[in-house]
Amino acid sequence: MNFYSINLVKAHLINYPCPLNINFLWNYGFLLGIIFFIQIITGVFLASRYTPDVSYAYYSIQHILRELWSGWCFRYMHATGASLVFLLTYLHILRGLNYSYMYLPLSWISGLILFMIFIVTAFVGYVLPWGQMSYWGATVITNLLSSIPVAVIWICGGYTVSDPTIKRFFVLHFILPFIGLCIVFIHIFFLHLHGSTNPLGYDTALKIPFYPNLLSLDVKGFNNVIILFLIQSLFGIIPLSHPDNAIVVNTYVTPSQIVPEWYFLPFYAMLKTVPSKPAGLVIVLLSLQLLFLLAEQRSLTTIIQFKMIFGARDYSVPIIWFMCAFYALLWIGCQLPQDIFILYGRLFIVLFFCSGLFVLVHYRRTHYDYSSQANI
């Protein structure tokens, strides 16, 4: 068993063959794994002092911040790590879109399942501080499920967000990261099963071992990210949390503007700009399903240079519009629900789906095998 474990580590962490021309865009997976591990460690320490009760949840957070030794550090590292996880996840997905990573369907789908686990974990975790924004944000999101029979009662443990809700959310927030950790190993298994991609997209026998060549590149990226992570955690350069969430819950007073965390803003913009609650929920689910459908494409060649020569515009232009629509929805999500922003939000929702569907529908023409024309 010991020899098997040693050989497994050597095969996947030391001698794993990687393309020679991998650049810094391939660091996001390694960085995500490190930050996700930090999230689990800090979360376990915070959970040991947290009280999942509506009468004590807010005050247990204040106890961690004000009375425990370095409790404030663990709390802000955990909050900053959540933002960093989603930032790296979005960059990882966009890199996959740009370099046609969806042509490895097992790796792509397992990564998207992990992304869904991140979304659910972050949402239930946002409710746990039991501040004004946490309570009213959970109320708004759970009310979207009111069109589904008994869904709100099953999730919240009642007709509204209350004490059973925070207990259930705490259990989910504690368990889901460990489920996500299992999905991480599955994702790595499928990645190593097919082999890593590279910026040019061609399969070559010229490969180098992961250690020490590419590990040094990952460590260099980790040094840059950990500096930003510590600066944000210790000094709070960018205000990531809403001030209303530092106020204890008052069920009779609604905040002037209910805004989720920044990484939920694109989905919140879809919910806010659509007048019908069921329709908004369906659009959010379809936006996630669109990413899964991209794995149904089959490319005869993924060589980026040949695509750029013979047919890249049909692929790169809708991908660029897809990214622009996502960033525009992120900005619209934090704006007031005025008519102009609602109009822009609907336009960018249409652009988001049209650009994604264009890639799906035209993949046969866009990714025609031009290898014979390139004499390879």
Curated annotation (Swiss-Prot):
Family to which this protein belongs: Belongs to the cytochrome b family.
Keyword field: Electron transport, Heme, Iron, Membrane, Metal-binding, Mitochondrion, Mitochondrion inner membrane, Respiratory chain, Transmembrane, Transmembrane helix, Transport, Ubiquinone
Gene that produces this protein: MT-CYB
CDD domains: Cytochrome_b_N
Organism: Plasmodium falciparum
Positions that bind heme b b562: 78, 173
Positions with a binding annotation for heme b b566: 92, 187
One GO MF term attached to the UniProt entry: metal ion binding
Origin superkingdom: Eukaryota
Membrane topology reported for the UniProt record: Multi-pass membrane protein
Name of the featured protein: Cytochrome b
Role this protein plays: Component of the ubiquinol-cytochrome c reductase complex (complex III or cytochrome b-c1 complex) that is part of the mitochondrial respiratory chain. The b-c1 complex mediates electron transfer from ubiquinol to cytochrome c. Contributes to the generation of a proton gradient across the mitochondrial membrane that is then used for ATP synthesis.
Segments passing through the bilayer: 28-48, 72-94, 107-127, 169-189, 214-234, 274-294, 317-337, 340-360
GO biological process: mitochondrial electron transport, ubiquinol to cytochrome c
